[in-house]
Amino acid sequence: MMIEIGLIGKKIGMTREFYKSGQSVPVTVIKFDKGRVIHLLSKEKNGYNAVQIGFGKIKNSKLSKQMKGYFAKKNTEPKKILKEFRVKNLENFKEGNEIGIEIFKDTKFVDIRSKTIGKGFAGAMKRHNFAGLRASHGVSISHRAHGSTGQNQDPGKVFKNKKMAGHMGDKNRTMQNIEIIKSDPDNNLLYLKGSIPGSKNTQVEVKESVKNIRKLTMAEKIEKIEKLKKIPEKKKK
């Protein structure tokens, strides 16, 4: 059964782990705080079923008067982030319940969502991988320009989403089917294969993979290869 809710943690850096075969794999480490169910939204009252979960700690002094009252009414400590997850039914959830990385106990692949590193204002060559203009032969002080931006008097405008220089990075991005290499429930750490967008301390949302494809993990692939190696070859006639 698919896990409908997710967790929000922060990226604390990269390291590497080793498979039983000795092969190393780069991993990104995500640190989670225990999430708490703050509020339940029902189809009868709100038009859809959802679970509101709070993540992270925040000082009471940084909250607005309305949010102070909200958390006091729910009889829970203030949370930095409130996130809604739509669910089919609310039977398994109750206000005040804590949720940790144990929800990914039987999960092999996850989808993550985080914000990319901001690069500031960038030209077309860096931002869109344009080739640029020629180094000589008629080109003067336009070597890194993006070239033509439109047509003629008709349509007489630059179309929206034209690739030009502008602000690069600092965008929300989703990566799918990221393999879980290891989980550490005692320290609330999740080790994900490869790199993910964002710098250290970037907020990362992790959910079970929606595509739910039948894909082998790298450890399973290595194990399969090792088994095939042990099968003796047929003697040549």
PLM regions with names:
Residues M1-K237:
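Extended basic (Lys/Arg/His-rich) segments that typically form rRNA-contacting surfaces
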